[in-house]
Amino acid sequence: MPKYRSATTTHGRNMAGARALWRATGMTDADFGKPIIAVVNSFTQFVPGHVHLRDLGKLVAEQIEAAGGVAKEFNTIAVDDGIAMGHGGMLYSLPSRELIADSVEYMVNAHCADAMVCISNCDKITPGMLMASLRLNIPVIFVSGGPMEAGKTKLSDQIIKLDLVDAMIQGADPKVSDSQSDQVERSACPTCGSCSGMFTANSMNCLTEALGLSQPGNGSLLATHADRKQLFLNAGKRIVELTKRYYEQNDESALPRNIASKAAFENAMTLDIAMGGSTNTVLHLLAAAQEAEIDFTMSDIDKLSRKVPQLCKVAPSTQKYHMEDVHRAGGVIGILGELDRAGLLNRDVKNVLGLTLPQTLEQYDVMLTQDDAVKNMFRAGPAGIRTTQAFSQDCRWDSLDDDRANGCIRSLEHAYSKDGGLAVLYGNFAENGCIVKTAGVDDSILKFTGPAKVYESQDDAVEAILGGKVVAGDVVVIRYEGPKGGPGMQEMLYPTSFLKSMGLGKACALITDGRFSGGTSGLSIGHVSPEAASGGSIGLIEDGDLIAIDIPNRGIQLQVSDAELAARREAQEARGDKAWTPKNRERQVSFALRAYASLATSADKGAVRDKSKLGG
C-alpha cells in the first residue's frame, strides 16, 4: 500500500518543525491524517483566459475540504501569447512551458503534496501543467477556465462573428478604414476565457478530455456560463476520491500515467486531427508523452494523419463556427462519438470519472444520451455581454446542433474532408518532419511550387510582407526561429495574418523552423526539423531556390541538387563558431533564454530539454 506523500511532513516527532509551519497555515491535529491536495491555479490579470480564475481555486479548495482532504493553493505564471506576439516577448512563450512544469514539480515535491487539481486555460499553461502531472504521476484532475465567447459586430448590414485574428488582419489591411478596424478591435474579444476559436488553448483543453484527465465539457463549455461552475465543484470532490483510491486501496488506475496511456494519446491526436486543432498541440503532446515515458512520436502522428478525416471545422479555418458552436454540437464527446462510430478510437481507455470510452459516450454523447441534464448542459450558450466574470450568465441555445450532415460536427459520411486537419510532411530540408494545419489550407494550394524568399527573423519577414517585397507565388522562409535558434520558437501569427492583409493568403506559402499560433491558417508549414540552429538543411536554402509542397502526398522538397546542398553545407561549416547562426540579425537574448536554448531540442522532439546533456 503506498504511503501518503504528505506523511513525510506531518508524521513523526522529527517533523515537529514542519507541523508547526503547517499549523501556521491553518491546519489542525485532525488534518494531519488527511491527504494534502495542491490546487494549482494560474490566475493573472495579464491574460483574459486567466483573469477570472482568482476565486476558482477557493471554490475547488472548499470542495476538497468538504470531501475530507486538505487543500493548499499556489499559482503558476501565465504568458498571453497574443499580447506577447510580434515582438521580443514571444521569445519567452514556449520556454514558459518548461518553467511552469518545473514550478509545479518544485512546489508539489518540496511540500510532499499527495495529488493535484490543475486550473489552467491558455496556450502554455495547460501543456506545462500536463507535463508536470505526468512527470510526478500523482492523482490529478484538470479543469480549465473555459473558452471566450465569440465576438460579434455589424459590418455591411450583417452581423458577423469575430475573434482575435480578425482584429490582427484588419488592423494591418490598408484597405480597411480606421473606424472599421477600431470597431473590430473593440468587438473581437468580448469576455474572459481562452480566445474563441480552435486555437492552441482550446485545442489543448479539448485534448485533456480525450486523454481522460478532465471531465466532459471541459474543452468547450464557455467561461462565462453558470454551468461551468459544476466542473470546478466536481473536480474538488472527485480528486479526493481518486487520491484515496490510490493511497488507501492501492488502485494505480487512479494515476495519470495509467489514464493517459499510449492508447489515450493516440485518441487525443486522432481528435486533434479530426477537429483541425492547433499545430502547437503536436509539440505539446510529444513533450507530454516523454514525461509519461510513452513511446509516442512524429511517426505515430503521421500514421494517424493519413487515416483520420476532418469532422469539425472551427475558426480560424472558418468564421462560421467558434467554440460555443462546438459545444452546442456536443463538444469533444460529440466528436469522439463520431470517431468511435467510424472505428477510429481505442476503446479500452478510462477517464478521471472512472468511465470507459463506451460508458462516457453512452452518458455524454448528445447523439446517444437519454440524460436531459447532459443535453441541457450542451445547450449552454453565449450571452453577448462584455464581462471578466466567470459563471456570469445562463443563456441557452433553443436546441442542440445534432445535424451531422451539415452542422458544426460531421459524421464520417459527411466529413469536411477525408484527410484530417493536420499533416506531417517530410523532405530534403525537413528530414525529421514538419507540420501543416491542412484544415486551414485552401484546396487550390494543396500543391504549391514557388521561389524562396529567405529571412532570418520574423521581424524581417514582416517588414518585407508589409513593404510589398513578397508577391504572389513566393515561398516565404523564416529560419533561425526554432527552439534553439530563436531562442524560444516564436509563433508566426503576424506574418501569416499580414499575408492575408496584403491579399496573399491563398497566393503564398510560409515555411519556418518556428511555430504558428493556433490562430494561423493558410499554407503555413512549421516545426521544420532539424531546425537551422541545429544544422538543419533549412539553413541552406537561398533566395530564388524553388520549393515544392505536396500536401496530398505528404512531401516538401527543395529543388536543389544533393551536390549543391553538400557544397552549401561545407561553406556553412567553414564559418566556424558562427556556423548555423543568422548572418544579419541583431537580437538581445537574455541569460535565461540562453540557458533554455542550450538544452532545447528541435520540434520533432517536442522542443523539450535534451536530457543527454544533463547525463540523464
UniProtKB/Swiss-Prot annotation:
<dbReference type="InterPro" id="IPR056740">
    <property type="entry name" value="ILV_EDD_C"/>
</dbReference>
<dbReference type="InterPro" id="IPR042096">
    <property type="entry name" value="Dihydro-acid_dehy_C"/>
</dbReference>
<dbReference type="InterPro" id="IPR004404">
    <property type="entry name" value="DihydroxyA_deHydtase"/>
</dbReference>
<keyword id="KW-0479">Metal-binding</keyword>
<dbReference type="GO" id="GO:0009099">
    <property type="term" value="P:L-valine biosynthetic process"/>
</dbReference>
<dbReference type="InterPro" id="IPR000581">
    <property type="entry name" value="ILV_EDD_N"/>
</dbReference>
<comment type="function">
    <text>Functions in the biosynthesis of branched-chain amino acids. Catalyzes the dehydration of (2R,3R)-2,3-dihydroxy-3-methylpentanoate (2,3-dihydroxy-3-methylvalerate) into 2-oxo-3-methylpentanoate (2-oxo-3-methylvalerate) and of (2R)-2,3-dihydroxy-3-methylbutanoate (2,3-dihydroxyisovalerate) into 2-oxo-3-methylbutanoate (2-oxoisovalerate), the penultimate precursor to L-isoleucine and L-valine, respectively.</text>
</comment>
<dbReference type="GO" id="GO:0009097">
    <property type="term" value="P:isoleucine biosynthetic process"/>
</dbReference>
<feature type="binding site">
    <location>
        <position position="123"/>
    </location>
    <ligand>
        <name>Mg(2+)</name>
    </ligand>
</feature>
<dbReference type="InterPro" id="IPR020558">
    <property type="entry name" value="DiOHA_6PGluconate_deHydtase_CS"/>
</dbReference>
<feature type="binding site">
    <location>
        <position position="122"/>
    </location>
    <ligand>
        <name>[2Fe-2S] cluster</name>
    </ligand>
</feature>
<dbReference type="InterPro" id="IPR037237">
    <property type="entry name" value="IlvD/EDD_N"/>
</dbReference>
<dbReference type="Pfam" id="PF24877">
    <property type="entry name" value="ILV_EDD_C"/>
</dbReference>
<dbReference type="GO" id="GO:0005829">
    <property type="term" value="C:cytosol"/>
</dbReference>
<comment type="similarity">
    <text>Belongs to the IlvD/Edd family.</text>
</comment>
<feature type="binding site">
    <location>
        <position position="81"/>
    </location>
    <ligand>
        <name>Mg(2+)</name>
    </ligand>
</feature>
<dbReference type="GO" id="GO:0000287">
    <property type="term" value="F:magnesium ion binding"/>
</dbReference>
<feature type="modified residue" description="N6-carboxylysine">
    <location>
        <position position="124"/>
    </location>
</feature>
<dbReference type="GO" id="GO:0004160">
    <property type="term" value="F:dihydroxy-acid dehydratase activity"/>
</dbReference>
<keyword id="KW-0408">Iron</keyword>
<keyword id="KW-0456">Lyase</keyword>
<dbReference type="Pfam" id="PF00920">
    <property type="entry name" value="ILVD_EDD_N"/>
</dbReference>
<comment type="pathway">
    <text>Amino-acid biosynthesis; L-isoleucine biosynthesis; L-isoleucine from 2-oxobutanoate: step 3/4.</text>
</comment>
<keyword id="KW-0001">2Fe-2S</keyword>
<feature type="binding site" description="via carbamate group">
    <location>
        <position position="124"/>
    </location>
    <ligand>
        <name>Mg(2+)</name>
    </ligand>
</feature>
<protein>
    <recommendedName>
        <fullName>Dihydroxy-acid dehydratase</fullName>
        <ecNumber>4.2.1.9</ecNumber>
    </recommendedName>
</protein>
<keyword id="KW-0028">Amino-acid biosynthesis</keyword>
<dbReference type="GO" id="GO:0051537">
    <property type="term" value="F:2 iron, 2 sulfur cluster binding"/>
</dbReference>
<keyword id="KW-0460">Magnesium</keyword>
<comment type="subunit">
    <text>Homodimer.</text>
</comment>
<feature type="binding site">
    <location>
        <position position="491"/>
    </location>
    <ligand>
        <name>Mg(2+)</name>
    </ligand>
</feature>
<feature type="binding site">
    <location>
        <position position="195"/>
    </location>
    <ligand>
        <name>[2Fe-2S] cluster</name>
    </ligand>
</feature>
<feature type="active site" description="Proton acceptor">
    <location>
        <position position="517"/>
    </location>
</feature>
<comment type="pathway">
    <text>Amino-acid biosynthesis; L-valine biosynthesis; L-valine from pyruvate: step 3/4.</text>
</comment>
<keyword id="KW-0411">Iron-sulfur</keyword>
<keyword id="KW-0100">Branched-chain amino acid biosynthesis</keyword>
